[in-house]
UniProtKB/Swiss-Prot annotation:
<keyword id="KW-0285">Flavoprotein</keyword>
<protein>
    <recommendedName>
        <fullName>NADPH-dependent oxidoreductase</fullName>
        <ecNumber>1.6.-.-</ecNumber>
    </recommendedName>
</protein>
<dbReference type="InterPro" id="IPR016446">
    <property type="entry name" value="Flavin_OxRdtase_Frp"/>
</dbReference>
<dbReference type="InterPro" id="IPR029479">
    <property type="entry name" value="Nitroreductase"/>
</dbReference>
<dbReference type="Pfam" id="PF00881">
    <property type="entry name" value="Nitroreductase"/>
</dbReference>
<dbReference type="InterPro" id="IPR000415">
    <property type="entry name" value="Nitroreductase-like"/>
</dbReference>
<keyword id="KW-0288">FMN</keyword>
<keyword id="KW-0560">Oxidoreductase</keyword>
<comment type="similarity">
    <text>Belongs to the flavin oxidoreductase frp family.</text>
</comment>
<dbReference type="GO" id="GO:0016491">
    <property type="term" value="F:oxidoreductase activity"/>
</dbReference>
<comment type="function">
    <text>Reduces FMN, organic nitro compounds and disulfide DTNB. Involved in maintenance of the cellular redox state and the disulfide stress response.</text>
</comment>
<keyword id="KW-0521">NADP</keyword>
Length: 251
């Protein structure tokens, strides 16, 4: 049994600095085909991938994201929940399918499909020697992204992904993840608070030491402090409204 894929994914880290070398059409096609091979719920394939190499479109999306690597990369993908094609099928169907694809379950199916496709692309890109970074920041202004990309009803932008050759001075490294025993529950969920707090305290120490070493003492916050800052920020509270404007999560 080979550990090749295991070792590959264990080295994963986000790359935020890329060389100015566009991906070839052949590479883009292979990445998309790898993504399409992902599992999909009930064969709905409720996603689409928008590939972007137009610099003006990239710049418009950078304004939404606020991140320079939305422009400075080898290629940009945007992953969307896509029920537009299902809506077209619905126009000639004898039953009302919108009750399904416009439901909360439909939203979950589309989001999971898009995520599985994207992870296939990420692993394939890293196997080819490229780096990637996911871009949830495109949800900072969903309405603007829908306008930039001409998204019809029943299509919703979930996240993007920048891909490219890592820059020579790119020095990212895999961050320590939550402990195995904290995320893996055998047979049923173990919610004992004392155990949970103890595991998180150990992890907070690990993350603080990681940042301390990576930044020569300039950064020492814990994982819990990061979570408090991020979730306490109350960002993107318009998601339900934007989803419903797209024709999704109507029930």
């Amino acid at each position: 049994m080979s550990d090749y894929v295991y070792n590959l994914v264990k080295k994963h880290h986000s790359v935020r600095k890329f060389k100015n070398k566009p991906l070839s059409e052949d590479v883009v096609k292979k990445l998309v085909e790898a993504g399409q091979s992902a599992s999909t719920s009930s064969f709905l394939q409720a996603y689409s991938i928008i590939g972007i190499d137009d610099e003006k479109i990239k710049e418009n999306l950078r304004e939404v994201s606020g991140q320079p690597y939305v422009v400075e990369n080898g290629y940009l993908f945007v992953f969307v929940i896509d029920y537009y094609r299902h809506h077209l099928v619905d126009q000639h169907a004898e039953t009302d399918m919108e009750n399904a694809y416009g439901s909360t379950e439909g939203l979950l199916v589309g989001a999971i499909d898009a995520a599985l496709v994207a992870e296939n692309i990420a692993v394939t890109a890293e196997d080819m020697g490229y780096g990637i970074v996911f871009l949830g920041s495109l949800r900072n202004d969903v309405e603007r992204v829908r306008e930039i990309l001409d998204l019809p009803d029943y299509v919703f932008p979930v996240f993007g992904m920048a891909v490219g050759e890592p820059a020579d001075d790119e020095n990212g490294a895999a961050k320590p993840r939550l402990p195995f025993d904290h995320v893996f529950h055998h047979n049923k969920y173990h919610a004992d608070k004392e155990t949970q707090y103890a595991q998180m305290a150990d992890y907070d120490q690990t993350i603080s030491e990681y940042y301390d070493q990576r930044t020569n003492g300039n950064r020492k916050e814990t994982w819990s402090q990061q979570i408090e800052m991020f979730l306490g920020n109350k960002a993107r509270l318009d998601m339900l409204e934007q989803l419903q404007k797209s024709g999704l999560i109507q029930r």
